[in-house]
């Protein structure tokens, strides 16, 4: 089963209960979690309550200014999460995030794999974002041909393949499944295309880094013409004005 913060276009909803399995065969549940607090009476991050066996860490930056004082405050909560991963579990982390590396260095019980890293899981662009060569420790694992674009989606693919491998799915089968993945609504979703060459995308990016990454992906796909970005700062962090400078820089 799964519970995520968006609606996959391959499925009808953002959540599904696990199907019944044979006796002694474990069922799996995938949950998208973040560091926001649990409730007004429990200021621990929500993900502390999930007790994962396989943990994917995509990124760690300052966010949720209404809850956290600074980046170190968030690192503390991520450290609590990392410490509850069992010894037989696995942490799959983004090698490009220094903050994640620093948090992992605080101590962990479990095995660690990195993606977006030549020493771990990596990709090479073959013919644009739609064709990626997937490698693990410099050994080719297969070619991913899909409809998604952008470095963030490619990194997510690496993390998904690594997580699938940890629960017993071969990289070959994971890559084949990803080739059928159509993306998530409001995540770089192309909602209109006009005869004059104008394409219209809808994206949920609400953090300056996410906005910058989204625009970078579009720039590599839409090679001609202007890019016009319309931003609605709706998150609490953005409404508090905590990232005015970062927001301006993300649009350059």
Go through the PLM ranges and name each one:
Residues 1-9:
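Short beta-strand-centered segment that lines the nucleotide-binding/catalytic pocket of NTP-utilizing
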Residues 5, 94, 117, 232-234:
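Cofactor-binding loop segments of dinucleotide-utilizing enzymes, especially the Rossmann-like FAD-
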Residues 10-12, 16-26, 30, 37, ...:
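Acidic, Mg2+-coordinating active-site environments of NTP-dependent enzymes
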Residues 13-15, 103, 212, 239-242:
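Short, well-ordered secondary-structure micro-motifs
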Residues 37-51, 208-220:
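Switch II of P-loop NTPase G domains
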Residues 40-43, 66-72, 238-241:
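Glycine/threonine-rich flexible loop motifs
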Residues 184, 209, 216-252:
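Active-site beta-alpha connecting loops in nucleotide-dependent enzymes
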């Amino acid at each position: 089963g799964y519970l995520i913060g968006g609606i996959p276009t391959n499925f009808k909803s953002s959540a599904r209960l696990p199907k019944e399995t044979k006796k002694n065969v474990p069922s799996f549940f995938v949950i998208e979690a973040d560091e926001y607090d649990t409730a007004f009476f429990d200021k621990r991050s929500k993900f502390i309550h999930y007790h994962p066996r396989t943990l994917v860490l995509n990124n760690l930056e300052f966010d949720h200014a209404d809850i956290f004082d600074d980046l170190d405050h968030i690192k503390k909560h991520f450290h609590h999460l990392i410490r509850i991963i069992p010894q037989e579990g696995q942490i799959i982390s983004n090698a490009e995030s220094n903050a994640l590396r620093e948090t992992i260095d605080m101590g962990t019980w479990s095995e660690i794999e990195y993606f977006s890293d030549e020493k771990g899981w990596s990709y090479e662009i073959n013919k644009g974002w739609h064709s990626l060569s997937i490698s693990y420790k410099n050994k080719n694992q297969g070619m991913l041909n899909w409809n998604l674009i952008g470095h963030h989606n490619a990194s997510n693919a690496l993390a998904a393949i690594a997580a699938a491998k940890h629960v017993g799915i071969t990289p070959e089968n994971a890559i084949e499944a990803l080739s059928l993945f159509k993306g998530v609504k409001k995540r770089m979703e192309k909602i209109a295309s006009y005869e004059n060459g104008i394409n219209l995308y809808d994206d949920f990016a609400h953090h300056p880094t996410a906005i910058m990454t989204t625009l970078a992906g579009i720039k590599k796909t839409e090679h001609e013409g202007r890019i016009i970005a319309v931003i609605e700062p709706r998150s609490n962090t953005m409404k508090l004005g905590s990232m005015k400078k970062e927001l301006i820089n993300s649009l350059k």
